[in-house]
């Protein structure tokens, strides 16, 4: 029977519940247990697809086209297991489902209430993951902080869930803060005690405490928390700050987290194999060749807006024994401040995705600089569209060329709306989303990097290259090296006269893994190393 681990958070938000959940997933998988991780988000949006990156960070897209919380990216990267739309649940989606059932008459005229209808729907979503994926363990992260009014239906649902499924099949893990107070020179347990008290008032007694702290727990703290929170001392697990999130599974393994989880769930204790993960962390900390990469975007004030891009770069840097340094460049300020000043001496330039006209001219200027200066360049989604506009204006001779998204009256709409998007009014969940096949041109840079002729990548866009300009681009030196299998949609463009210039309509960052860096990011950093007269082992990773 499937076991369930619920992860709640207390005291403050952004305490690291997602990393703890993902790390536990890695520890269980290292013991040959199958795992799926579910995120329950308390906001009323149906999904984060229409939310501002400044508020929410990046939107992570799954193979089946779900627009989800960025934590699902952590889940995939740590467990190397694809997530789906079943792994992301919001208050909005719960209420939407319940209201739809009420409109259909499913409740037979009954009064629809938070208990039992909302809580039953939450429990059904949890069970659906277990039924669909049949994992040994489902880890469920509850978004928000205990005490938030938005989280109450989820907490009530998981309280009921433990009673219905059975205590030996369910475990409650609470991630909390144990702060160091400099003026007192002491660690304080009171915030954790109050957080657990709040949780217990709802009817949930945590089985394990994960104690977030900026330093090792001082002697006596574990015993004090054990006494006041009614948790066995061996289940009070310190989680001090780490230099990298990829070190967290190893730290939690040393503290015995997985052992306690298996004990409490009556699962067999198995020997873990974390050798590859240990080697990954050693390579990360052993990297000694610095390489600076510029990320040119309009959401750079919040680095989480480009989280998967940064992680994909980091995966490749680890494989290439490079110390990755990110130079954040605000595309809104780029033209005014000067492109050369902002991008001088960078090893590579990445222009990631986005929506809307704001900051686009800065992205185009950065792409022109990369092309003219021979700096390795990778464009992603909107980054490819901006590369098309840049080429159209400066090489193909199409004055005022633009995307129809930014200028509906442009004389040269080199980027236009996908035909199937013409009559769509709603914004949420209506783009070209999810995993699609792409056919690569023989002998192209893309084929050389991937080592395959047909690839599969995740998409999130409404606009595409306008095929009316395809021949002109080919005649002026661009190459179209990736298309949809029917040849209709342009997915990859290259400039072969450049050391490394490639742009793609999809989001390769979502499929990069710590132990399997994505070929495009690996190729970018390898080209940057070559440009810097550094040795690099090979063009594609060998994992």
Curated annotation (Swiss-Prot):
Transmembrane segments: none annotated. Residues 292-534 form the Glutamine amidotransferase type-1 domain. The active site is at 381 (nucleophile), 507, 509. Keywords: ATP-binding, Glutamine amidotransferase, Ligase, Magnesium, Metal-binding, Nucleotide-binding, Pyrimidine biosynthesis. One of its GO terms (biological process) is 'de novo' CTP biosynthetic process. Catalyzes the ATP-dependent amination of UTP to CTP with either L-glutamine or ammonia as the source of nitrogen. Regulates intracellular CTP levels through interactions with the four ribonucleotide triphosphates. This is CTP synthase. The gene is pyrG.
């Amino acid at each position: 029977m499937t076991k369930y681990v619920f992860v709640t958070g207390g005291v403050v938000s952004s305490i690291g519940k997602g990393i703890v959940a993902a790390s536990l997933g890695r520890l269980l998988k290292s013991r040959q247990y199958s795992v799926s991780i579910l995120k329950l988000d308390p906001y009323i949006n149906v999904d984060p697809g229409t939310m501002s990156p400044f508020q929410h960070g990046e939107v992570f897209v799954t193979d089946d086209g779900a627009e989800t919380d960025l934590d699902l990216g952590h889940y995939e990267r740590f467990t190397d297991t694809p997530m789906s739309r079943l792994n992301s649940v919001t208050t909005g989606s719960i209420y939407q489902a319940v209201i739809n059932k009420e409109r259909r008459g499913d409740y037979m005229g009954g009064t629809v209430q938070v208990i039992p209808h909302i809580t039953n729907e939450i429990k059904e979503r949890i069970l659906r993951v277990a039924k669909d994926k049949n994992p040994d363990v489902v880890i469920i992260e509850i978004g928000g902080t205990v005490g938030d009014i938005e989280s109450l239906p989820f907490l009530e649902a998981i309280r009921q869930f433990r009673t219905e499924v059975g205590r030996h099949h369910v475990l409650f893990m609470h991630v909390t803060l144990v702060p160091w107070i400099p003026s007192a020179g002491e660690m304080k347990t009171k915030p954790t005690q109050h957080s657990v008290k709040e949780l217990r008032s709802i009817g949930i007694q945590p089985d394990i405490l994960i104690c977030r702290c900026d330093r090792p727990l001082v002697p006596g703290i574990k015993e004090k928390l054990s006494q006041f929170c009614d948790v066995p001392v061996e289940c009070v697990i310190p989680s001090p700050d780490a230099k990298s999130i990829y070190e967290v599974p190893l730290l939690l393994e040393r503290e015995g987290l997985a052992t306690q989880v298996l004990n409490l769930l009556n699962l067999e204790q198995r020997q873990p194999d974390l050798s590859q993960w240990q080697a990954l962390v050693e390579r990360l900390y052993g990297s000694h060749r610095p390489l600076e990469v510029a990320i040119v975007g309009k959401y750079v004030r919040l680095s989480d807006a480009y989280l998967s891009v940064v992680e994909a770069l980091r995966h490749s840097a680890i494989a290439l024994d490079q110390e990755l340094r990110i130079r954040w460049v605000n595309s809104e300020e780029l033209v005014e401040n000067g492109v050369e000043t902002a991008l001088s001496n960078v090893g590579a330039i990445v222009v990631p995705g986005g929506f809307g006209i704001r900051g686009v001219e800065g992205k185009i200027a950065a792409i022109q600089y990369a092309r003219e200066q021979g700096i390795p360049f990778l464009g992603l989604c909107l980054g490819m569209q901006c590369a098309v506009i840049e080429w159209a204006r400066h090489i193909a001779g199409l004055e005022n060329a633009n995307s129809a998204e930014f200028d509906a009256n442009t004389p040269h709409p080199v980027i236009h709306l996908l035909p199937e998007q013409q009559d769509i009014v709603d914004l949420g969940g209506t783009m070209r989303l999810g995993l699609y096949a792409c056919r690569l041109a023989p002998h192209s840079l893309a084929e050389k990097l991937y080592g395959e002729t047909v690839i599969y990548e995740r998409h999130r866009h409404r606009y595409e290259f306008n095929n009316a300009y395809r021949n002109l681009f080919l005649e002026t030196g661009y190459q179209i090296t990736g298309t949809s299998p029917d040849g209709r949609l342009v997915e990859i463009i290259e400039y072969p006269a450049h050391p490394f210039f490639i742009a793609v309509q999809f989001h390769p960052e979502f499929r990069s893994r710590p132990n399997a860096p994505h070929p495009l990011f690996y190729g970018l950093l390898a080209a940057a190393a070559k440009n810097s007269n550094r040795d690099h082992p090979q063009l594609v990773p060998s994992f």
